[in-house]
């Protein structure tokens, strides 16, 4: 479904190079030390960075140089990027039409995803009137309403308390299963990864140093466990 072949990004003339295959509907965690290249990997997939070489295909179609707006990808960041002067409904609606001129079908999709996120009673509010968790639900709803086959998460819940973070991770996992979306999630927490991703990829020094079962990483028996400070 998603295939990266020697996708290379030059960071201060030092190459970060990634090869990775992710199947449709798979939920994969991307782990590794700070500065290892995790966010760079997601940005290359999303199209926010243009690779120096290599190829990226989605469903067999070459997207290596495709602009972000034409890629079948949605991405959620730690900063939710909500527009403070727009209501919750309008912020979600941007995922369907940048001009916010929604037809009846689009209106129905918007309200359905709001109910799924548990924010249907907040549609008339502004982002400044919401809690941090509620704002991230709105941002997630805006991603999901686009119905793109790939969802990228760059630590969007790291600022939330543990209980709320677990709640959001469960919500993401359930939503991806319902929509048959492929999920790649950057995280610093192997425990968070284990909640939703059976497979993990460990990035170190701009390379994929290891990939395999998340539980193996948690056990401390994987060759990359030490990179994450996990001992058996």
Curated annotation (Swiss-Prot):
Catalytic activity line of the entry:
thiamine(out) + ATP + H2O = thiamine(in) + ADP + phosphate + H(+)
EC number(s) from the headed UniProt entry: 7.6.2.15
List the membrane topology term(s).
Answer: Peripheral membrane protein
Domain ABC transporter span(s) in chain numbering = 2-230
The record, for SUPFAM superfamilies, names: P-loop containing nucleoside triphosphate hydrolases (SSF52540)
The protein's GO terms of the molecular function aspect are:
ABC-type thiamine transporter activity; ATP binding; ATP hydrolysis activity; thiamine transmembrane transporter activity
An example GO CC term for this entry is: membrane
At the top of the EC hierarchy, this enzyme's class is: translocase
Binding of ATP, residues: 32-39
Alphabetically ordered keywords of this record? ATP-binding, Cell inner membrane, Cell membrane, Membrane, Nucleotide-binding, Translocase, Transport
Q: Which residues form the signal peptide?
A: none
Where does it reside? Cell inner membrane
| Biological process annotations from GO | thiamine transmembrane transport
**The organism's place on the tree of life at top rank:** Bacteria
- Where would you say this protein principally sits, based on its record? membrane
**Quaternary structure and interacting proteins, as annotated:** The complex is composed of two ATP-binding proteins (ThiQ), two transmembrane proteins (ThiP) and a solute-binding protein (ThiB).
Listed PANTHER family = SPERMIDINE/PUTRESCINE IMPORT ATP-BINDING PROTEIN POTA, THIAMINE IMPORT ATP-BINDING PROTEIN THIQ
| Physiological role | Part of the ABC transporter complex ThiBPQ involved in thiamine import. Responsible for energy coupling to the transport system.
NCBIfam families attached to this UniProt entry: PRK10771.1, thiQ
User: Which protein, by its recorded name, is this?
Assistant: Thiamine import ATP-binding protein ThiQ
- Please tell me the species this chain comes from: Escherichia coli (strain K12)
């Amino acid at each position: 479904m998603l295939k990266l072949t020697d996708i290379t990004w030059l960071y201060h003339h030092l190459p970060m190079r990634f090869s990775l295959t992710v199947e449709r509907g798979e939920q994969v965690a991307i782990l590794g030390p700070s500065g290892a290249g995790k966010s760079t990997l997601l940005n290359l997939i999303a199209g926010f960075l243009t690779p120096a070489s290599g190829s990226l295909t989605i469903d067999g179609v070459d997207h290596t140089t495709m602009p972000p707006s034409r890629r079948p990808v949605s991405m959620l960041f730690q900063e939710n990027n909500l527009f403070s002067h727009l209501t919750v409904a309008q912020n979600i609606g941007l995922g369907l039409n940048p001009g916010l001129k929604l037809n009846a079908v689009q209106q129905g999709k918007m309200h359905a995803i709001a109910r799924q996120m548990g924010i249907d009673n907040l549609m008339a509010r502004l982002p400044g009137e919401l809690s941090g968790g509620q704002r991230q639900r709105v941002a997630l709803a805006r991603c999901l309403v686009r119905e793109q086959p790939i969802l990228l998460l760059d630590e969007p819940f790291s600022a939330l308390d543990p209980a709320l973070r677990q709640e959001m991770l469960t919500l993401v996992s359930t939503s991806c299963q319902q929509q048959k979306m492929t999920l790649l999630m950057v995280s610093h927490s192997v425990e968070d990864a284990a909640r939703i991703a059976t497979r993990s990829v460990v990035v170190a020094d701009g390379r994929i140093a290891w990939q395999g079962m998340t539980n193996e990483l948690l056990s401390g028996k994987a060759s990359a466990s030490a990179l994450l400070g996990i001992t058996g």
